[in-house]
From Swiss-Prot:
Chief location bin: endoplasmic reticulum
Keyword Ligase found: no
Positions carrying Phosphoserine: S168, S170
Organism in which the protein naturally occurs: Mus musculus (Mouse)
Name of this protein: Cytochrome b-245 chaperone 1
Subcellular location(s) of the protein: Endoplasmic reticulum membrane
Role this protein plays: Functions as a chaperone necessary for a stable expression of the CYBA and CYBB subunits of the cytochrome b-245 heterodimer. Controls the phagocyte respiratory burst and is essential for innate immunity.
Record gene name: Cybc1
Description of how the protein assembles with itself and partners: Interacts with CYBB; CYBC1 may act as a chaperone stabilizing Cytochrome b-245 heterodimer.
Membrane topology classification: Single-pass membrane protein
InterPro entries, per the entry: Cybc1
GO CC terms in record: endoplasmic reticulum; endoplasmic reticulum membrane
Length: 187
């Protein structure tokens, strides 16, 4: 699953993502290798601690981040939060939380983009496009699997932000601006 809907009201949409089963399986597998190396080796205690610590470090490095997106119409902001256990351990608990705050009115479009995932094929992610020309992914990593899960989240965000309804009046005003003046407008 790409992201789970935590809460959904007319003014607030809260999406969450936690590390998936692949990520946890990789953590257990790498950590088990370190524990097995320490248990079955005849090395000193220092080396055994090195095996376990090294494998724990590599395992946590490969763990996906916890991510959440909060769209709030009352404040007019989107808050994208990321929590990384690896950064938290690496900086000795000083960092690990990243946060991006964007105004809702700056979001022009929501797209699904395809990204190559090394060794595994294709992954998909939702990208927010802003009026300034910049774009920002909803999550930091692409999800492998079905594109339909990611498209469902993109449609949910689009309907919550009413992006397609906002385009219709502007299209009408552009078409009325391009129409030739009537008989009263000519001199």
């Amino acid at each position: 699953m790409y992201m789970q809907v935590e809460t959904r009201t007319s003014t607030r949409l809260h999406l969450k993502r936690a590390p998936g089963i692949r990520s946890w399986s990789l953590l257990v597998g790498i950590l088990s290798t370190g524990l097995a190396a320490a248990y079955y080796s005849g090395d000193s205690l220092g080396w055994k601690l090195f095996y376990v610590t090294g494998c724990l470090f590599v395992a946590v490095q490969n763990l996906e981040d916890w991510e959440e997106a909060i769209f709030n119409k009352n404040t007019g902001k989107v808050i994208l939060k990321t929590f990384s256990l690896y950064k938290k351990l690496l900086t000795l608990l000083r960092a690990g939380h990243d946060q991006v705050v964007v105004l809702l009115k700056d979001i022009q479009d929501v797209n699904v983009e395809e990204e190559k995932v090394r060794y595994f094929g294709k992954g998909y992610m939702v990208v927010l496009r802003f009026a300034t020309g910049f774009s920002h992914p909803l999550t930091q990593s692409a999800v492998m699997g079905r594109r339909s899960d990611v498209e469902a989240i993109a449609k949910l965000i689009t309907s919550f932000l009413e992006l397609h309804r906002l385009e219709s009046p502007s299209e009408r005003s552009q078409s009325s601006d391009s129409e030739p003046d009537g008989p009263g407008g000519q001199s």
